[in-house]
Amino acid sequence: MISGSIDRYSPLALCVALAAVAATFLASPVRAATDSETRTTAPFHAVAFAGSWTVDVKVGGENSVVIEGKKDLIAKVKTEVVDGELRVGIDNGLLSFFSHQDLDGLTAHITVPELTGFALRGSGKADIGGLNGGKTAFELDGSGNLNAKGKLDTLGLVVNGSGTVDLSGLETAKASVTINGSGDATIDPRETLAAVINGSGQVAYVHEGVKVTSVIHGSGMVEKK
């Protein structure tokens, strides 16, 4: 009886069965270990990041910084406040705050009482919410994506490269926008818009009745969305 059972499993059948088990194992997703770490910093009112970040910024509340992602990457992240600006970069023993080392998989959760400035360099993505009055200067260098919502009195924006900025949900009285390269920006000024484009960039505004002044060098354009 035992002999007959063994005979039914030929070498070919065993190979097929083992291959099926291996394929199932390889197809199963392998989840990398993730962790989070809260950083203690001096007070700050501006933020600067570089690399392939996902950054969530909440305006309104006490300063806080939480880094989330793979443990080995979190350990390399350096946070420091210089003249009221929170800088986040990779600590590799060199001048690294604005290194474009790949940080894919990391997310920074930031809370700030007020946001006077925000800079994103590289190919990261930033979402900012809760802006409420005052003046904020934004800068996007590279191919990243920047989104912000809320309300401001005055908005300043500089885009260097091919990045995309969506501020259609950020109402502002006055806006000043400069694009160097092929980037594009959508904004919502209600009174005035001053735009400068050097290259093929595009600026779109969403509200009627805005007084627009523009200087364009190249094939760029300013238009009502």
Outline where the language-model segments fall.
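Short, surface-exposed interaction patches in beta-rich subdomains
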Residues: 148-225
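Bacterial N-terminal signal peptides
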Residues: 13-27
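Acidic (Asp/Glu) and glycine-rich low-complexity loops/linkers
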Residues: 2-9, 28-121, 127-139, 149-156, ...
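Short, recurring structural edge motifs at helix starts
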Residues: 33-35, 123, 143, 182, ...
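Short helix-to-loop capping/linker segments positioned immediately adjacent to catalytic or ligand/cofactor-binding
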Residues: 124-128, 144-147, 162-165
